[in-house]
C-alpha cells in the first residue's frame, strides 16, 4: 500500500510541476491567465498536501493498530485488481459483517478491469437485488452499467422445498399422514437448506462451459455457520455415500445424492485447489466476528481449504468525537488481541463507510472513497423506548421463562443479564442460564440473593445426549443400524435437541424462580420435539418414545403465557432479516413473539462525528421497520464502548 501511495503522490507532484510549467508559459501571453492558473495551482497544491497529511495520518493510525512478529506491519487496503485473485472466490463470515458489499465491489472492480465476471449468491439473506437495483433470477442477469458482469441469485430455501418434495412425494398415499408429516419436519432444518445450496452451486464450479465463459466466478456465500456446514458436506457426505449400504434406512437428506457423487468429488477438488480457489474470510474489528473468523478458518483448513485471506471490514481511522474515539480504541484493542493463527494470514482492510453499499456508484467507491454529504436530511425517530419498558411488561404479565433470541454477536447474553437484573430489582428470584462457551457471564453479573446462574456446556450436553441415545440403541439394534444412528447424531439439529434438554432440566429445577436464558430453540427444534407424532423419528425409535419428563413439561409451557421469547437484533439489514426468519420459524411452532430489542444503536449514541452520524442516520429506516413490525413493542439500547457488566447493566434500562 505504501508503494501505491508514494506512486500516487509522485504522480500528483508531476501533475503540479507540469501545471506550474504551463502557468509560466501562460504568463508570457496574459496576466489574467497567470492569476487564474496560479490560483488553480495553489488550490491543487493545498489539495495534495491535505491528501498527504490524510494519507500519513491513516498510515500512522494503521501502523499503531497491530504489531506482529515483533515488528510493525500495516494492513493493506483491499484492492481486488492488485491482489492477484484466483478464478473462484468464496466470501464467508458472520451475518452482517459486509460479505455481500465486498463481494459486489470485488465483482464490479474486476469487471471494470475488463474481466468477465459471474457473481452468485447462495445466501438465504441475500440482498443482491437491492444492491444492484435489478430483479435477479437463478439463470443470470447482465448488469447494464457494468460491462462483463453477470449476477444470479440462488435461493437455497426454495431449492430445499423442491428437494424435500422430490424425496417425500414417492411415499405420499403409501405411508400414514403422521409419518409423512414427521418426514417433512426432518427435511425442514438447516441441513436440507445447505445440501440444496451445495447442489445448486456445485454445478457452477464443475461445469467446463461456465468455467471457459468467465475469468472470475464469485460466491457471496451464506454467513459462517451455514457456509461451514455447506463446505463440509462434500467430504462428509461423499464418505457416507460410499459407506452407505442401508438402502431405505438411510437419512432422508441423502436421497438422490448418489447420482451427484462425481460432481461433488470434482467440486471438493476445486475448492481445495489453491491455484483455482481463494476463501476470503470477511470480519470486523470486533471480538465476536474475529472469533467466528478464527473458527471458520480452522475448520475449513481441516477440509484442506488452505488458500485463505482475511478482510477486516469497517475500520475507522479518523475519530473526531468521544463516541468515535471509543469505537476506534475498541477496534484497535480487538485487532491487537487477534489470535496468532489469524495474524499469520494475509490480511487486508476496508475502511468504514458512511453509506449503505446500494447502487453501482456506491459499489464502485467502496474500496477507494467515502462520501459524507453535509446536506443529507437527518432522519428522526418519534420514540426510542427503553429496555425498562420490556422488563416492566415481563414482570407485570408474570413471565416465568424468558429467552433472548438472535444471531451471534448481537448481544443476547448482555441483554439477558440486564433483564435478569431488572427482574431481580423488583424482588423476583431469577436464574440466569447461558450457553456462552467462555464462562464470562460471571464477569458480567454477580450472583446475589435474588440472582443465581447456570451454565450449559453445549459440547458436554451433546456428548451426554449422544452417549445416552447410543447406549439404549445398542440394546436392540444391529451394528448397521447403529452406524446410521451415529450419523444422524452428528446433525446440527441433534445439538439443538441436546441443549434444549438441558434448558428443560434447569426450568424444571427452578420452578419457584423466573428463568432467563440467553439463547432460544428454533421452531424447527420445537417441532421435532413436539410430541410422539412429530418427535424426531429416529430418536423416538432409539429411546422407545421415552422423552424426558422435563421436556414433556416444558413443551406446553412454551406456548403458554408463562413464556416470552425476546428477539435481539441490530439496526442493520442482515441482522433484521435474520431475526425475521427466526421469528417466522418460531411461528411455525406456534410460539408468539411480542418484544424486539435493537442493541448497540449508533443513532441513539448521538455521535457528532460525521461518519458515525451518517451511519446512525442509516439505522433509522431499520428502527422504523422494527417498530412497525412489532406494533411498537420494541426497545433501543445505545452503542456502548465498554463491556457492560455489574452495576453498568442498569445503564441499559
Locate the predicted segments by residue:
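Switch/connector loops and helix/strand junctions flanking conserved nucleotide-binding motifs
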Residues: 126-131, 159-163, 225-229, 290-291, ...
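Short, structured motif recognition centered on aromatic/hydrophobic residues
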Residues: 90-91, 106-110, 119, 124, ...
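Walker A/P-loop NTP-binding active-site region of P-loop NTPases
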Residues: 90-92, 97-151, 221, 231-235, ...
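P-loop NTPase motor core
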Residues: 126-188, 192, 439-490
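C-terminal lobe/tail of nucleotide-utilizing enzymes
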Residues: 54-60, 64-83, 268, 272-399, ...
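Conserved catalytic network of the ASCE P-loop NTPase/AAA+ motor domain
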Residues: 82-83, 110-113, 143-145, 207-212, ...
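Phosphate/Mg2+-binding loops and adjacent switch elements
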Residues: 172-286, 292-295, 476-574, 578-581
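Long, intrinsically disordered low-complexity tandem-repeat segments
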Residues: 1-45
Amino acid at each position: 500500500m505504501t508503494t501505491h501511495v508514494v506512486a500516487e503522490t509522485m504522480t500528483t507532484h508531476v501533475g503540479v510541476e507540469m501545471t506550474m510549467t504551463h502557468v509560466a508559459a501562460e504568463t508570457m501571453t496574459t496576466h489574467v491567465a497567470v492569476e487564474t492558473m496560479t490560483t488553480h495551482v495553489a488550490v491543487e497544491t493545498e489539495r495534495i498536501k491535505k491528501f498527504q497529511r490524510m494519507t500519513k495520518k491513516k498510515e500512522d493510525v494503521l501502523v499503531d493498530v497491530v504489531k506482529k512478529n515483533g515488528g510493525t506491519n500495516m494492513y493493506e487496503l483491499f484492492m481486488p485488481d492488485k491482489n492477484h485473485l484466483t478464478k473462484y472466490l468464496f466470501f464467508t463470515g458472520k451475518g452482517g459483517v459486509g460479505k455481500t458489499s465486498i463481494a459486489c465491489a470485488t465483482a464490479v472492480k474486476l469487471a471494470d478491469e475488463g474481466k468477465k465476471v459471474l457473481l452468485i449468491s447462495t445466501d438465504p439473506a441475500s440482498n443482491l437485488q437491492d444492491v444492484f437495483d435489478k430483479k435477479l433470477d437463478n439463470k443470470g442477469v447482465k448488469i447494464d452499467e457494468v460491462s462483463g458482469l453477470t449476477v444470479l441469485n440462488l435461493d437455497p430455501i426454495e431449492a430445499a422445498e423442491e428437494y424435500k418434495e422430490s424425496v417425500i412425494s414417492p411415499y405420499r398415499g403409501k405411508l400414514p399422514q403422521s409419518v409423512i408429516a414427521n418426514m417433512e419436519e426432518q427435511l425442514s432444518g438447516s441441513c436440507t437448506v445447505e445440501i440444496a445450496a451445495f447442489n445448486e452451486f456445485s454445478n457452477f464450479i464443475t461445469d467446463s462451459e461456465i468455467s471457459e465463459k468467465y475469468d472470475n466466478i464469485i460466491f457471496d456465500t451464506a454467513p459462517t455457520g451455514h457456509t461451514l456446514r455447506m463446505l463440509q458436506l462434500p467430504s462428509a457426505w461423499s464418505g457416507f455415500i460410499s459407506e452407505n449400504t442401508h438402502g431405505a434406512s438411510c437419512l432422508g437428506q441423502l436421497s438422490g445424492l448418489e447420482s451427484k457423487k462425481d460432481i461433488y468429488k470434482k467440486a471438493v477438488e476445486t475448492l481445495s485447489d489453491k491455484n483455482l480457489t481463494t476463501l476470503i474470510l470477511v470480519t470486523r474489528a470486533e471480538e465476536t466476528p474475529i472469533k467466528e473468523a478464527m473458527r471458520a478458518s480452522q475448520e475449513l483448513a481441516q477440509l484442506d481449504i488452505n488458500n485463505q485471506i482475511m478482510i477486516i471490514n469497517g475500520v475507522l481511522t479518523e475519530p473526531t468525537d468521544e463516541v468515535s474515539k471509543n469505537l476506534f480504541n475498541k477496534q484497535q484493542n480487538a485487532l491487537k488481541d487477534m489470535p496468532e493463527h489469524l495474524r499469520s494470514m494475509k490480511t487486508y482492510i476496508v475502511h468504514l463507510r458512511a453509506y449503505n453499499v446500494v447502487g453501482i456508484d456506491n459499489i464502485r467507491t467502496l474500496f477507494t472513497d467515502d462520501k459524507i454529504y453535509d446536506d443529507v436530511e437527518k432522519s428522526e425517530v418519534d420514540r426510542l423506548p427503553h429496555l425498562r419498558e420490556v422488563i416492566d411488561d415481563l414482570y407485570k404479565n408474570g413471565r416465568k421463562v424468558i429467552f433472548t433470541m438472535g444471531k451471534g454477536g448481537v448481544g443476547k447474553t448482555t441483554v439477558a443479564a440486564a433483564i435478569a437484573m431488572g427482574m431481580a430489582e423488583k424482588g423476583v428470584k431469577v436464574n440466569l442460564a447461558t450457553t456462552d462457551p467462555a464462562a464470562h457471564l460471571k464477569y458480567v453479573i454477580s450472583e446475589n440473593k435474588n440472582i443465581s446462574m447456570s451454565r450449559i456446556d453445549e459440547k458436554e450436553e451433546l456428548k451426554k445426549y449422544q452417549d445416552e441415545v447410543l447406549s439404549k440403541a445398542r440394546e436392540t439394534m444391529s451394528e448397521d443400524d447403529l452406524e446410521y444412528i451415529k450419523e444422524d447424531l452428528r446433525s446440527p439439529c441433534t445439538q439443538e435437541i441436546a441443549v434444549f434438554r438441558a434448558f428443560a432440566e434447569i426450568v424444571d429445577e427452578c420452578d419457584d424462580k423466573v428463568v432467563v436464558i440467553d439463547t432460544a430453540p428454533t421452531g424447527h427444534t420445537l417441532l421435532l420435539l413436539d410430541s410422539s407424532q412429530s418427535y424426531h423419528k429416529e430418536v423416538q425409535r432409539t429411546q422407545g418414545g421415552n422423552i424426558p419428563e422435563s421436556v414433556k413439561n416444558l413443551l406446553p409451557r412454551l406456548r403458554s403465557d408463562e413464556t416470552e421469547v425476546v428477539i435481539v437484533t441490530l439496526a442493520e439489514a442482515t441482522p433484521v432479516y435474520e431475526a425475521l426468519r427466526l421469528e417466522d420459524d418460531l411461528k411455525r411452532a406456534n410460539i408468539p413473539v411480542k418484544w424486539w430489542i435493537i442493541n448497540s444503536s449508533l443513532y441513539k449514541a448521538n455521535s457528532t462525528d460525521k461518519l458515525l452520524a451518517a451511519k446512525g442516520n442509516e439505522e433509522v429506516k431499520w428502527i422504523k421497520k422494527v417498530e412497525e413490525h412489532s406494533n411498537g413493542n420494541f426497545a433501543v439500547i445505545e452503542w456502548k464502548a465498554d463491556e457492560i457488566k455489574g452495576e453498568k447493566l442498569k445503564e441499559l434500562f
